[in-house]
Amino acid sequence: MPTYRTPDVYIEEISVFPPSVAEVETAIPAFIGYTANTTLITAGDLVNAPRRVKSLLEFESYYGRGPTYTVTRANLDEAGNFLSADISNSYVMYDSLRLFYDNGGGDCYIVSVGAYKSSGSPVDRDEVKAGVQAVAKVDEPTILLFPDAATLNADDLAAVQQEALKQCGELKDRVAVLDLRQGDPNGVSFRDKIGINNLKYG
């Protein structure tokens, strides 16, 4: 109790209730893409099954680590010293998730759309769209991300992005982060193909 220096009537309030403002997560992203592992108990049971994870370590315990990289060309100077390398990798979701946690990320949802492929077309439009549709059943995610889809051709990428925007427009509780293709730095192809529906959610 404080010591008062002047005579007067003082009222002290004693709080019997905890503070009424509770900490609430404001944004929970959902990462949709390919993973090393797609099986937890039965074959493929992690595919298109949104799962909440709290850390990169927990992600790795369910889904495995990132893909192996293929060096397609190494550039050397005249003395034979390494300058740079061209690396081939179609799967970037693991790296995106790692950067998310490196920058203070918290809980998020993971939707595996399949395992890494060693041959054929690495990223399939219909698989990624199915992952986007699967996350619609979960109420918590507020941000949809599908970084692996950026390697699709322009038409297929636009189809996936339109599916995500459609979901955001219907549910009205989430937004989508839409990546541009590497060959479209000014976004001309993106603007031509994305359409006009639900753009405020992207």
PLM regions: where:
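Surface-exposed assembly/interface segments
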Residues: 1-202
